[in-house]
Regions:
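Compact, glycine-rich, soluble single-domain proteins
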Residues: 2-68, 85-86
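Helix-rich terminal scaffold detector
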Residues: 35, 72-97
């Protein structure tokens, strides 16, 4: 859901790791947008064989470096959104450092 991408700062085609809490699989994949307001996360490609509807997932992204190897953005703060079983965001966790 592009709304969720905006909420947590994910970019289209950004590499992410998907930690499947249900079965322990940890595929690396990339982000593709779903329609705003769809409240959906979809795992496609090879990663789709490692997840099932209803699995609990943790999606992790990492910092980026510019052409001068400077960290972008200059200030990084984790932003975590918790999703309920009906795929609604219900809580935000910030600044876990």
């Amino acid at each position: 859901d592009e709304d969720w991408m905006d909420e947590v700062g994910l970019l289209i085609h950004e590499q992410v790791d998907v930690y499947n809490k249900t079965n322990g699989n940890r595929p690396t994949t990339y982000v593709l947008p779903l329609p705003r307001g769809s409240n959906e996360v979809s795992v496609n490609g090879a990663g789709a064989h490692l997840t099932e509807v209803g699995d609990e997932l943790i999606i992790c992204s990492y910092i980026y470096l510019d052409d001068n190897y400077e960290v972008m953005p200059l200030r990084h703060e984790p932003r975590i959104k918790l999703i309920d079983p009906k795929d609604r965001m219900y809580r935000e966790l910030l600044g876990l450092n």
